Amino acid sequence: MLLASVPQLDRVAIQLGPFPVYWYGIIIGTGVLLGLWLATREGERLGIPKDTFVDLVLIAVPIAILFARMYYVIFEWEYYAQNPSQIINIRQGGLAIHGGLIGAVITGVLFAKRRGLSFWKLADIAAPSILLGQAIGRWGNFMNQEAHGDEVTRQFLEGLHLPDFIINQMYIEGVYYHPTFLYESLWNFAGVILLLALRKVNLRRGELFFTYLIWYSVGRFFVEGLRTDSLMLGPLRIAQVMSIGLVVISIIFIIVRRKMGQADKRYLEN
């Protein structure tokens, strides 16, 4: 009875005959399109043809989704070994951002090499777009009622001055939960603003992308500590380990590239 008194959003956006179209996919797609728009706009300003990022997205997005799913399945193999038919079922979630990032970077490196372009220039331009996509994508987790934190009271959520639709969606099987999707989404939106501002600073090439990695990783580390559905390796939360690793690697790359003279070009240079 209590569950029925809390109105919640349906994870299915529309029904096309026997096929449900989930909000998760629509939201992810929206993030990709807005990120593409942002990247093509900046790319044209820096002399990169509009179709460059369109071509890159058409290749990188499917590969990123594949890697994101593979990453998730690997760390949840105990379940998927018993349910192999569910490995390809991504309609209700199960995509790991770090896996997708690995796939996107590999694709970007190969794409840039084939086109005779600077990977670091493409990565710098794409950095705000990637973070924007991540900020929007977290709302797909919201619709799926996943990637949440520990139990809290309704009074706690009301104390955060959240709208009712968020509070109600965080009511899962009789319990209210931390809206960690929201914390990460807001952190990422703030990061987008920071990266857009840093474009005007004219950083060394590649350092805008590393700033993105550092910013995202710091936020993800703390948010992950609140989550109850983390991918685990023994006692370790995989996302926290990856976040620490990305921060350290990014700082090392910035220092080493400067010392070796590989970061002499600036963001605005052609």
From Swiss-Prot:
Can you name one GO molecular function term for this protein? phosphatidylglycerol-prolipoprotein diacylglyceryl transferase activity
UniProt protein name: Phosphatidylglycerol--prolipoprotein diacylglyceryl transferase
Any single GO CC term annotated in Swiss-Prot or TrEMBL for this entry: plasma membrane
**One record GO biological process:** lipoprotein biosynthetic process
Tell me the pathway: Protein modification; lipoprotein biosynthesis (diacylglyceryl transfer)
Q: Does the keyword Isomerase apply?
A: no
PROSITE patterns per the UniProt record, alphabetical: LGT
Q: What is its main location?
A: membrane
| Family membership | Belongs to the Lgt family.
Q: Which residues bind a 1,2-diacyl-sn-glycero-3-phospho-(1'-sn-glycerol)?
A: R138
So what EC number does this one have?
2.5.1.145
User: What are the leading ranks of the lineage?
Assistant: Bacteria, Bacillati, Bacillota, Bacilli, Bacillales
Give the matching InterPro entries: Lgt
Keywords (alphabetical) are: Cell membrane, Membrane, Transferase, Transmembrane, Transmembrane helix
Q: PANTHER family per the record? A: PHOSPHATIDYLGLYCEROL--PROLIPOPROTEIN DIACYLGLYCERYL TRANSFERASE, PROLIPOPROTEIN DIACYLGLYCERYL TRANSFERASE
Cellular location(s): Cell membrane
Q: How does it sit in the membrane?
A: Multi-pass membrane protein
